[in-house]
Swiss-Prot record:
GO terms for cellular component: plasma membrane. It comes from Pseudomonas syringae pv. tomato (strain ATCC BAA-871 / DC3000). Keywords: Cell inner membrane, Cell membrane, Membrane, Transmembrane, Transmembrane helix. Disulfide bonds: none annotated. This is UPF0060 membrane protein PSPTO_1628. The lineage of its organism: Bacteria, Pseudomonadati, Pseudomonadota, Gammaproteobacteria, Pseudomonadales. It comes from the Bacteria.
């Protein structure tokens, strides 16, 4: 269960870092936004290595579902945009897929 904490923290820092670049490059904010962006993205990478997984690719694939949950939450909470029904439907499919990937090795064990 600690994996989910690492996934959610990693998602928070990844989205925050990417959003800082978005503010600079898409919304004309100060280039100083690069500093928190780089710090956030570094923390994202470090946190993702804390996940207990035998293979990086599987950890990243499972993380993708968590990232999408966090992105939709960011859309609503930070950007103040109400998610569409299709956002929720896509999110549900992604979470199911990420769960299958994350739990797959346990189901496949002899």
């Amino acid at each position: 269960m600690l994996n989910y904490l690492w996934f959610f923290l990693a998602a928070l820092f990844e989205i925050a870092g990417c959003y800082a670049f978005w503010l600079w490059l898409r919304q004309g904010k100060s280039a100083l936004w690069v500093i928190p962006a780089l710090i956030s993205l570094t923390l994202f990478a470090l946190l993702l290595t804390r996940v207990e997984a035998a293979y990086a690719g599987r950890a990243y694939a499972a993380y993708g579902g968590i990232y999408i949950v966090a992105s939709i939450a960011w859309l609503g909470l930070v950007e103040r945009v109400r998610p569409l029904g299709t956002d929720w439907l896509g999110l549900a499919f992604c979470v199911i897929g990420a769960t299958i990937i994350l739990l797959g090795p346990r189901w496949s064990a002899p």
